Curated annotation (Swiss-Prot):
HAMAP family xref list: HisF
Taxon lineage: Archaea, Methanobacteriati, Methanobacteriota, Methanomada group, Methanococci
Record field: catalytic activity: 5-[(5-phospho-1-deoxy-D-ribulos-1-ylimino)methylamino]-1-(5-phospho-beta-D-ribosyl)imidazole-4-carboxamide + L-glutamine = D-erythro-1-(imidazol-4-yl)glycerol 3-phosphate + 5-amino-1-(5-phospho-beta-D-ribosyl)imidazole-4-carboxamide + L-glutamate + H(+)
UniProt-listed Enzyme Commission number(s): 4.3.2.10
Localization in the cell: Cytoplasm
GO CC, alphabetical: cytoplasm
The family this protein is said to belong to: Belongs to the HisA/HisF family.
One of the GO biological process terms: L-histidine biosynthetic process
Keywords recorded for this protein, A-Z: Amino-acid biosynthesis, Cytoplasm, Histidine biosynthesis, Lyase
Subunit structure: Heterodimer of HisH and HisF.
Enzyme class name: lyase
Entry-linked NCBIfam families: hisF (TIGR00735)
Name used for this protein in its record: Imidazole glycerol phosphate synthase subunit HisF
Pfam families hit by this protein: His_biosynth
Length: 272
């Protein structure tokens, strides 16, 4: 079994780290460079910066934040938000990022995945998916013909891809989209459950497992981490390759090292 990764996520708005619940009610959580240094010292395997307003508003000062972080932190850094072109990839990589995450632009312009992977390498291209459960009220609905339906304790649902920071549904089935981005050349999928986001009730294991079983790409589980057991569950039951978390680290409820110790106790390989 490959070593599992623990990845702190920093949602950045106007140069500050913020955290919300279900993609809303954002609260300030600190300075991105300072938090990055703390997580680096705690043993984080990677960091993810998501400029959460950039796809919807104009790009802010994320390049400056990336530069300042890359000067002081020496673990892989993934940056996403407002990346629309190959030139945007180039600018963020030059600022010090190791990987680029695309979400809205991948859905709007799928060929960007292919172009970027051919120029910069597949390892550089992370496709982020914001996904929400779409519960079925009418099983005979014609629109369900091309959807992957799952039974959950709350009822039957399919998983819908959202764009623009979770503001707009696309009607695209998440399983089918994951398979498509793999073919186009993505190197990794950052999979966020909008239903679980910020709740601290655990990752959406049905979603995570469904995507993990359908593609060969590494899957980063995101949304809902509230304790170390949730991370273990994401690896064991969700079959994720990495776990992303924010709130529990930002508000110092635990450290990266605490999480890794619990994962190791469950005979899951991690790097210290």
């Amino acid at each position: 079994m490959l070593t599992k990764r623990i990845i702190p996520c920093l949602d950045i708005k106007e140069g500050r780290v913020v955290k919300g619940t279900n993609f809303v009610e954002l609260k300030d959580a600190g300075d991105p460079v300072e938090l990055s240094k703390i997580y680096n010292e705690q043993g984080a395997d990677e960091l993810v910066f998501l400029d959460i307003t950039a796809s919807f508003e104009k790009r802010g000062i994320i390049i400056d934040v990336v530069k300042r972080t890359a000067e002081q932190v020496f673990i892989p850094l993934t940056v996403g938000g407002g990346i629309k072109t190959v030139d945007d990839f180039r600018k963020i990589l030059r600022a010090g990022a190791d990987k680029i995450s695309i979400n809205t632009s991948a859905v709007k312009t799928p060929k960007l995945i292919k172009e970027a992977s051919e120029i910069f390498g597949t390892q550089c291209v992370v496709v982020a998916m914001d996904v929400k459960r779409n519960y079925i009220t009418n099983p005979r609905d014609e629109n369900l013909k091309d959807k992957n339906v799952f039974e959950t304790k709350h009822g039957s649902c399919w998983f819908e891809v959202y764009i623009y920071g979770g503001r707009e549904g696309t009607g695209i089935d998440a399983i089918e989209w994951a398979k498509k981005v793999e073919i186009l050349g993505a190197g990794e999928i950052l999979l966020t459950s909008m239903d679980a986001d910020g709740t601290k009730d655990g990752y959406d294991l049905v979603l995570t497992r469904a995507i993990s079983e359908k593609v060969k790409l590494p899957i980063i589980a995101s949304g809902g981490c509230g304790n170390a057991k949730h991370v273990v569950d994401a690896f064991k039951d969700g079959k994720a390759d990495a776990a992303l978390m924010a709130s529990i680290l930002h508000y110092r409820e635990c450290t990266v090292n605490d999480l890794k110790k619990e994962v190791e106790k469950n005979n899951i390989p991690v790097r210290f």
